[in-house]
Amino acid sequence: MNLITTIITITITLSAVLATISFWLPQISPDAEKLSPYECGFDPLGSARLPFSLRFFLIAILFLLFDLEIALLLPLPWGDQLNTPTLTLIWSTAVLALLTLGLIYEWTQGGLEWAE
């Protein structure tokens, strides 16, 4: 019980000291650059209707699909312990084949070409 009391006392003391120091430190004088919001390099006062690249959107959707594929295939080793592991293999192969065919179609249509 003595250890818990010591830890609580140290915690409260350290918190009080840090709070007191934060009030005593001098305030840094703000300038125009520190007061302006920074939003990923874009001018926050400009137009909010910037053109959005459709190719970037398609690449993002493909990334999400293949990320979901990994999440679906991670429990595949545990599927071997079921009563019918061949059914698990058939379903996982079907998912992989469907995603591979979709990727090939997207590639042949030129959806993965960033520059024309």
Swiss-Prot record:
Cysteines joined through disulfide linkages: none
Q: Does the keyword Transmembrane helix belong to this entry?
A: yes
Pfam annotation, one family: Oxidored_q4
Membrane spanning stretches: 3-23, 56-76, 87-107
Q: How does it sit in the membrane?
A: Multi-pass membrane protein
Q: Which UniProt keywords apply?
A: Electron transport, Membrane, Mitochondrion, NAD, Respiratory chain, Translocase, Transmembrane, Transmembrane helix, Transport, Ubiquinone
Q: Does the keyword Translocase apply?
A: yes
Return the EC number.
7.1.1.2
Q: What is its main location?
A: mitochondrion
Localisation per UniProt entry: Mitochondrion membrane
Q: What is a GO molecular function of this protein?
A: NADH dehydrogenase (ubiquinone) activity
Q: Name one GO cellular component term.
A: NADH dehydrogenase complex
Reaction catalysed by this chain? a ubiquinone + NADH + 5 H(+)(in) = a ubiquinol + NAD(+) + 4 H(+)(out)
The similarity comment for this entry is:
Belongs to the complex I subunit 3 family.
What function does this protein fulfil? Core subunit of the mitochondrial membrane respiratory chain NADH dehydrogenase (Complex I) that is believed to belong to the minimal assembly required for catalysis. Complex I functions in the transfer of electrons from NADH to the respiratory chain. The immediate electron acceptor for the enzyme is believed to be ubiquinone.
Any idea what this protein is called?
NADH-ubiquinone oxidoreductase chain 3
Source organism of the structure: Oncorhynchus gorbuscha
Q: What is the lineage of its organism?
A: Eukaryota, Metazoa, Chordata, Craniata, Vertebrata
